[in-house]
Amino acid sequence: MIQVLLVTICLAAFPYQGSSIILESGNVNDYEVVYPRKVIALSEGAAQQKYEDTMQYEFKVNGEPVVLHLEKNKGLFAKDYSETHYSPDGTRITTYPSVEDHCYYQGRIHNDADSTASISACNGLKGHFKLQGETYFIEPMKLPDSEAHAVFKYENIEKEDESPKMCGVTETNWESDEPIKKVSQLNLNHEIKRHVDIVVVVDSRFCTKHSNDLEVIRKFVHEVVNAIIESYKYMHFGISLVNLETWCNGDLINVQEDSYETLKAFGKWRESDLIKHVNHSNAQFLMDMKFIKNIIGKAYLDSICDPERSVGIVQNYHGITLNVAAIMAHEMGHNLGVRHDGEYCTCYGSSECIMSSHISDPPSKYFSNCSYYQFWKYIENQNPQCILNKPLRTVSIPVSGNEHLEAGKECDCSSPENPCCDAATCKLRPGAQCGEGLCCEQCKFSRAGKICRIPRGDMPDDRCTGQSADCPRYHSHA
């Protein structure tokens, strides 16, 4: 039986003794101290992973109880994820760390339909969530023998420079006199999954800011990509991190205050160097550099599959992952054919969306109706081949912990909310034909002939058989 645990809340009645990242900077002027408690146990029969597939926590915000539902982001890492750094003599060193049982989650607040959450549970709960229209952060506090966390609003973070910051891409606005077209007018084939594997490179200044601590840098970037994925899922577009490269022993290009020169140099380096080592479709350069003209990011337009131009550069704006994620999602949007929003563009009733030319405060996590139309128009017209192949398997572990289900189990019963699978018995629910797979839709086998995978090269498309949830390889069709 699942037991619900009560939560004890303690407002800050004791001296502050340090916390993590943002609070440690001393730039937060008001916060609550809370003690989150897990309120849902691992379902029966689930594997004993260190980080469960689904979790639920309860705490209070402004005196009101909050229940945070979390689900592991199984698509965060590509199946061949790697990390690269350089020795002092310039030797390239690449490792392949195990990221199967990772600690990055997305979620929502119970009874708040507009809520979102992007959380890491690596060492306590750290990240941000949207509650009743306001953006909050949560971080573990460094208090001896304590589970204390700090919760604070984005608006309570003091920023060094409040002047408007902007994207360096110019003359790209949505034409204000152009009617907002409906996506239904486009001839889209949503049966074909679009997905991109990205590389994130960090410069030497970013390393210095984080004391050259690769573990801290790694977690920062993972949190950023986790948040970006949340924004792009509303575009029906998948993103996975395939490589993290750190330049802590010196930059491999000339990083300048001129954003265009830095973008150009990074693109040339990607074409001449990075592409030879890592199979990917897009690269983003994260820097602790302040560009001239209040620019915080820049990218090439309509360039997602170009060896030199499928890149963007991103400033470590205020050192906040939410800000960095918004900028990186914005610059990737330009690579994917999306322009800046015009005056008639909205997202959930707001005019402050990801593709606004200036970053909002707090930054938006949503693309506008204009962005959605432009993105899919670009996909339809250009049909960029490098994003058509979703990885055959992103990192995720079935409940049994094996590639295949254990004997006697018909489906992955790790989530009690799976509509196809009975979590108590690991059997398919009555009427269900399947629980997951490229050819499984709403618990039924997909129709025969549906395209389920587009292979690279000249091989024909892989198609569902109508008799299985698996997507067979072409050579097995005959």
Curated annotation (Swiss-Prot):
Which intervals hold domain Peptidase M12B?
Answer: 194-391
Record key words, sorted? Cell adhesion impairing toxin, Disulfide bond, Glycoprotein, Hemostasis impairing toxin, Hydrolase, Metal-binding, Metalloprotease, Platelet aggregation inhibiting toxin, Protease, Secreted, Signal, Toxin, Zinc, Zymogen
Q: InterPro entries in the record, alphabetically?
A: Disintegrin_CS, Disintegrin_dom, Disintegrin_dom_sf, MetalloPept_cat_dom_sf, Peptidase_M12B, Peptidase_M12B_N, Reprolysin_adamalysin
Residue span(s) of domain Disintegrin: 397-478
* Glycosylation site residues: 279, 369
**Binding positions for Zn(2+) per the UniProt entry:** 330, 334, 340
Chain span(s) of sequence motif Cell attachment site: 456-458
Prodomain residues: 21-188, 392-407, 476-478
Q: CDD domains from the entry?
A: ZnMc_adamalysin_II_like
One short Pfam name that applies is Disintegrin
Q: Which residues form the signal peptide?
A: 1-20
**Cofactor(s) listed:** Zn(2+)
What EC number(s) does its UniProt record assign?
A: 3.4.24.-
PANTHER family the UniProt entry points to = ADAM A DISINTEGRIN AND METALLOPROTEASE DOMAIN, DISINTEGRIN AND METALLOPROTEINASE DOMAIN-CONTAINING PROTEIN 28
Subunit-level organization:
Monomeric (disintegrin).
Name the UniProt record assigns to this protein = Zinc metalloproteinase/disintegrin
